[in-house]
Amino acid sequence: MIVDKDKLVKSIEEAIKNGKKRRFVETVEMAVNLRNVDMKKPENRIDTVVNLPHGLGKPRKIGVFAKGDTALKAKEAGADVVITPEEIDELAKDKRRAKKLANSIDFFIAEAPLMPEIGRKLGPVLGPRGKIPQPIPPLADPKPFIDRLRNSVKIRTRDKTTFHAPIGSENMDVEKIAENAMEILKVVENKYENPTQVVKSVYVKKTMGPAVRVV
């Protein structure tokens, strides 16, 4: 392991304790700095979705592009927004509304047959934000996909050697936050041959609090 759990627990406890108390529940975040890896090569970049074992203390917001029965099932499954093919056209004509939607939703899923249209009409808005929908088979029940993404985070380095990810909320059990962090670090371990040579440093912090170095 890049970091042992006990060290993570102590660092998270310190970050929560050091941060000034706010009027809202703050998110606990992790920053991972990499080295000895050429991010100009696409194969070295990280771009993946990680399902956290304990969630973030609050569910992620999910948008679904669908029609007919799948759209109805998505609404029943509690999707935060369901976008029909007609609404794709409306959003394409109203970039401001499209950007607002893209910024307010954490993950999108879409029936596979709708993907080409979404890419053509909304790709310029969704792509740069890392919000291109995950395709699901036509007529598939969207509920399992929605439920999984509720507790997931997206990790994306692009061409940078640093990535940030939320790992929980300050009111969660610290052990659970640490286990979430370890799940994200597993991505780095599985991605690179010598992860200990690739990880330069790891920090944890509350949204508005000071960072605490883990390694």
Swiss-Prot record:
Any Pfam family hit: Ribosomal_L1
Annotated SUPFAM superfamilies: Ribosomal protein L1
BP-aspect Gene Ontology terms: regulation of translation; translation
GO molecular function: rRNA binding; structural constituent of ribosome; tRNA binding
Keyword vocabulary terms for this entry: Repressor, Ribonucleoprotein, Ribosomal protein, RNA-binding, rRNA-binding, Translation regulation, tRNA-binding
Disulfide bonds: none
Origin superkingdom: Archaea
Its job: Binds directly to 23S rRNA. Probably involved in E site tRNA release. Protein L1 is also a translational repressor protein, it controls the translation of its operon by binding to its mRNA.
Family recorded in the similarity comment: Belongs to the universal ribosomal protein uL1 family.
Subunit structure: Part of the 50S ribosomal subunit.
Protein name per the record: Large ribosomal subunit protein uL1
Source organism of this protein record: Archaeoglobus fulgidus (strain ATCC 49558 / DSM 4304 / JCM 9628 / NBRC 100126 / VC-16)
Taxonomic path: Archaea, Methanobacteriati, Methanobacteriota, Archaeoglobi, Archaeoglobales
